[in-house]
């Protein structure tokens, strides 16, 4: 099965809106008058102006146009890649509540029929274990941990046109270009823009061309010794937040008694606008996140997340084991899923092909070549543990150390 992306809709009169943004800074008249002039100017003149404005580097005008996309039956690997774009909104079919036994999967193209057959057999085996877990009473949110990362995902995505141009180029020429499925999605979006919004079909292969990574010679693999480590924290965070609160009200910052600071923070937290909290920033190291947990963390947009690349850092021998699996007597079958994915990926690497991760696993060690990387990754289960994710979440630090519900441990 091969999925696709559809440009469902975009802002009405997109060219006129963007052109109006280009005109307003240099033209007399009100906003409404300038928009009326842009409508009267027609598509050709507006597109010509847009090209001129963009060539001058003023790409922010594209943000006045909004696009809505649907991704149908793409791999979860593609979903994970896409949700990392923070200037976009995503609504994804939940694996916690929906039965995915018949979801289907995206199979990479294999030149060797034997490898294709081995891949299909491994994926079907993982789906079979998922069915067994569900039949035994394991909740869907725990059974999903054995599904391979090639299983189909469906979701809606909305973003402004500037971000859309960025996403298309990353898929086609940048970080996604090494995976055929991602590159094909990028080409499809370019083709749809060329047909409907030609002024957005801005190909930038030189800008997005990937450069080799640089690594210090003495660099050693990171082995976190705690589920969450605070790498850096704001000094005197309470004072900074209180100072920002006072400044926002035209008052001079001043030392407050403990009871005054407490009262101020209570007042702030009772209000819907709490921007003062952003003065206190934290950098956290998450050690041993499952791929499923990483997906949830990624969806929090107000953070700077730096997860290791799956290809270079995945290991199939470390994964979370939900308590519900043990309670239902399905531990042996669950572990079988890990061995199935590990064996299939090893065979793929020997053939220089690299997607079948189950969702429970975590990336910690070397994986495979990047030339046809999507193949081994497709076998990853979401239970795999992603041992190195560095983030800068600005909220809910106090909840970061709470263990995931129902996890019996890491194996």
Regions found by a protein language model. Give the residues of each.
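A conserved ligand/cofactor-binding region detector
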Residues: 1-411
């Amino acid at each position: 099965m091969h999925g696709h992306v559809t440009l469902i809709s975009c802002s009405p009169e997109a060219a006129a809106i963007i052109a109006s943004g280009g005109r307003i800074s240099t033209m007399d008249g009100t906003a409404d008058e300038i928009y009326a002039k842009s409508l009267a100017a027609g598509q050709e003149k507006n597109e010509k102006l847009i090209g001129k404005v963009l060539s001058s580097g003023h790409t922010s005008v594209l943000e006045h146009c909004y696009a809505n996309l649907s991704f149908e039956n793409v791999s979860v690997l593609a979903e994970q890649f896409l949700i990392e774009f923070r200037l976009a909104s995503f609504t994804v079919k939940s694996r916690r509540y929906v039965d995915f036994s018949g979801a289907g999967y995206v199979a990479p193209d294999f030149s060797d029929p034997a490898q294709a057959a081995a891949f299909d057999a491994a994926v079907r085996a993982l789906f079979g274990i998922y069915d067994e877990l569900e039949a035994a009473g394991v909740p869907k949110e725990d059974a999903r941990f054995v599904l391979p990362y090639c299983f189909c995902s469906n979701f809606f995505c909305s973003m402004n046109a500037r971000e859309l141009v960025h996403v298309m180029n990353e898929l086609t020429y940048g970080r996604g270009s090494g995976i055929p499925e991602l590159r094909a999605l990028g080409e499809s979006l370019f083709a749809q823009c060329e047909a409907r919004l030609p002024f957005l079909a801005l190909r930038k292969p030189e800008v997005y061309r990937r450069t080799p990574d640089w690594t210090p010679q003495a660099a050693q693999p990171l082995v976190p010794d705690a589920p969450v480590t605070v790498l850096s924290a704001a000094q005197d965070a309470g004072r900074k937040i209180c100072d920002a609160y006072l400044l926002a009200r035209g008052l001079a910052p001043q030392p407050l008694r403990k009871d005054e600071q407490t009262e101020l923070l209570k007042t702030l937290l009772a209000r819907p606008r709490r921007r003062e909290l952003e003065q206190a920033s934290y950098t956290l190291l998450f050690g041993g996140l499952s791929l499923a947990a990483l997906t949830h963390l990624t969806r929090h947009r107000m953070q700077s997340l730096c997860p290791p690349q799956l290809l270079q850092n995945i290991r199939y021998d470390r994964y979370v084991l939900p308590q519900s699996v043990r309670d239902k007597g399905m531990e042996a079958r669950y572990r079988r899923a890990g061995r199935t994915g590990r064996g299939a990926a090893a065979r793929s690497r020997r053939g220089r092909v690299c997607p079948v991760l189950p969702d429970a696993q975590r990336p910690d060690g070397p994986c495979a070549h990047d030339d046809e990387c999507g193949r081994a990754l497709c076998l990853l289960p979401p239970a795999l543990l992603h041992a190195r994710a560095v983030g800068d979440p600005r909220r809910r630090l106090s909840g970061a150390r709470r263990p995931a519900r129902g996890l019996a441990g890491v194996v």
